[in-house]
Amino acid sequence: MIRKAFVMQVNADAHEEYQRRHNPIWPELEAVLKSHGAHHYAIYLDQERNLLFATVEIESEERWNAVASTDVCQRWWKHMRDVMPANPDNSPASAELKEVFYLQ
């Protein structure tokens, strides 16, 4: 498995709405993530700084990257763009983090 971590932001007035939209996520989005090899996907909120910290384990970079081109992912991004900063293609503005320590 490949471990990934990344950060995003959520609008200061949208913490509750962001959480509501994820509980639960759309079943078809969950199915796409799982079918593309995503496991143990978690998102944490730093309420003071409006930061989201996400971790996920993936089976391959290619399969993970392919999620972005699915119809359900495109619809999800559009659904979320009003509660968080987004790129021109509606994907969440994010930065991948480099792993510097791991204890198994």
Swiss-Prot record:
> Which residues, by range, are in coiled-coil regions?
none
> Gene encoding this polypeptide?
rhaM
Subunit? Homodimer.
Q: Which Pfam families does the record match to this protein?
A: rhaM
Q: Name one GO molecular function term.
A: L-rhamnose mutarotase activity
Per UniProt, substrate binds at Y18, Y41, W76, W77
What InterPro entries does the entry give?
Answer: Dimeric_a/b-barrel (IPR011008), L-rhamnose_mutarotase (IPR013448), Rham/fucose_mutarotase (IPR008000)
Query: Which family, according to UniProt?
Result: Belongs to the rhamnose mutarotase family.
Catalytic activity, reaction form: alpha-L-rhamnose = beta-L-rhamnose
> What is the documented function of this protein?
Involved in the anomeric conversion of L-rhamnose.
- Assigned EC number: 5.1.3.32
Compartments (UniProt record): Cytoplasm
User: Which stretch is the leader sequence?
Assistant: none
What is this organism's lineage?
Bacteria, Pseudomonadati, Pseudomonadota, Gammaproteobacteria, Enterobacterales
Q: What is this protein called?
A: L-rhamnose mutarotase
Q: Which UniProt keywords apply?
A: Carbohydrate metabolism, Cytoplasm, Isomerase, Rhamnose metabolism
- Catalytic positions are H22 (proton donor)
One GO BP annotation of this record: rhamnose catabolic process
In the UniProt record, which is one GO cellular component term? Answer: cytoplasm
Record's keyword annotation contains Transmembrane? no
